[in-house]
A protein has these predicted regions:
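Basic, amphipathic N-terminal segments that precede the first structured/catalytic domain
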Residues: 2-97, 255-257, 261-262
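A basic- and aromatic-enriched beta-loop-alpha substructure that forms the phosphate/nucleotide-
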Residues: 65-140
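Surface-exposed cleft-lining segments at the edges of enzyme active sites
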Residues: 72-73, 107, 128-156, 185-195
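Well-ordered, non-membrane alpha-helical segments in soluble/globular domains
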Residues: 82-84, 144-160, 192-207, 240-244
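A structural motif corresponding to the C-terminal end of an alpha-helix
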Residues: 91, 153-172, 205-219
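Acidic carboxylate-rich catalytic motifs and surrounding loops in phosphoryl-/glycosyl-chemistry enzymes
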Residues: 173-177, 213-231, 235, 261-262
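Substrate-gating cap/lid alpha-helix
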Residues: 181-219
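Histidine-centered active-site loop/cap adjacent to the catalytic His
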Residues: 230-262
């Protein structure tokens, strides 16, 4: 759960040539930045595979030693387990844009006996010994009444804290619909047993709550995926044109805060 943060935030130097971007979420935001003009953005921080429900809890004592194939994977699982997203954001008050997409929420979360939460990421499940640990945890599925209710409460607190930090107006949610088909017309496969339509419908209810909180959201419909995407075929791995559209939306949003192009 989220909690108040009392210490003063650090400011980031604004004397830069590219839009300084903090990415919180998944591949939609990260790929948009990665596929853009390399001079357009400076990625100051990338927080991946962290559900909003884990923020403010500390599940590290519940987990075995985190041995993973890459340092990045270990860092992300450790940050998720520590629940310290807000501490990272407090260092970023000078960023131009905070990009957020909700894709990781699809995985659901695990709650332990002490109330702490860990995101049900593929990386978490890959940790040796995690299977037996999760046998004693309770799974909260994406789209369930409990997940939605708790997520909305967490989102309300999260946005309120961003407002206190003067970051709410720099928050932009990227929300293209998952693609039902790829550019060749082939239907995309179900994800974790659920249809693309299921995910688009459920995500829309979460996004509606953010809209009610006054959060800026970029919604794109009629999307198509690219089976030759750098990270493989998936309904959220889009064709290049969609990333160009998102790039334009980000630049337009950023210029409202800093009225000059870079």
């Amino acid at each position: 759960m989220l909690g108040g943060m009392q210490d003063s935030a650090e400011a980031v130097d604004l004397s830069k040539e590219a839009w300084r971007v903090f990415v919180y979420g998944g591949c939609v935001s990260r790929d948009t930045v990665a596929f853009a003009d390399p001079q357009a953005y400076s990625l100051v921080k990338y927080v991946a595979r962290n559900s909003l429900l884990s923020v403010g809890t500390d599940a590290r004592i519940q987990l075995p030693e985190l041995v993973l194939p890459s340092a990045f994977q270990k860092k992300m699982v450790d940050l998720d387990a520590s629940g310290e997203l807000l501490q990272e954001l407090r260092k970023m008050r000078g960023v131009d844009v905070i990009l957020w997409d909700l894709n990781i929420e699809r995985s659901g979360v695990w709650q332990f006996d002490d109330g702490s939460i860990a995101t049900n990421s593929a990386e978490l499940r890959r940790v040796e010994g995690m299977g037996s640990v999760l046998e004693n945890a309770r799974f909260i599925a994406f789209g369930s009444e409990e997940h939605y209710s708790r997520w909305c409460t967490a989102a309300t607190m999260f946005v309120a804290i961003l407002k206190e930090l003067e970051l709410k107006e720099r928050l932009l949610v990227l929300a293209p619909e998952w693609a039902a088909k790829d550019i060749q017309g082939a239907k995309n496969k179900r994800v974790a047993g659920e249809s693309i339509e299921f995910y688009n419908h459920v995500f829309s209810t979460y996004l509606a709550h953010l809209e009610n909180l006054g959060v800026a959201i970029v919604r794109l419909a009629d999307t198509v995926s690219d089976p030759d995407h750098k990270w493989g075929s998936a309904p959220f791995h889009y064709e290049k044109g969609l990333y160009n559209r998102l790039d334009e939306e980000i630049r337009s949003f950023a210029r409202k805060k800093n009225p000059f192009d870079r």
